[in-house]
Amino acid sequence: MDNFDNVLVVDADGHVYEGNVDLRSRMPEKWRSQAPIRMKDNEGNGRMLLEGRMWSASQGLGPGVSGPMTDKARGYREGMVDPVVRLKDMDAEGIDAAILFGTQIALTVNGLMSKELSAVLCRACNDWLMEYCCADPKRLLGVGLIPCQDP
């Protein structure tokens, strides 16, 4: 099979970076004071203050990979926050559609103590992701967050 013109190429593990998005405007008034706060630690690493706790950053690349994260690995591509840039990147790589998952907040909400705050943050992140995907809803397919504190 030499001709791939009729093959649909899907990135099934795409990521957006909602970590720098100000979610307060997407949260009900009574919860806005509990929105995540971004800050840097004494080594200049990005951290997040949420529920009165400082959430630590990863120090490695994952199981089976040794060594600290490099600045390049710690960063993010512009297309993770700007859907127009992502679509250009997808065109350059020949990707027809991307299934998109959140990162920083998405990996945090289910560790929160408050099931109500978790639900509010899930809704805020889902609203942001929906806006992101509106740039091309046939190609950008967001995976919503669901709070798991209250089965």
Name every feature range the model reports, one short phrase each:
Residues 1-151:
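Helix-coil boundary/capping segments in enzymes
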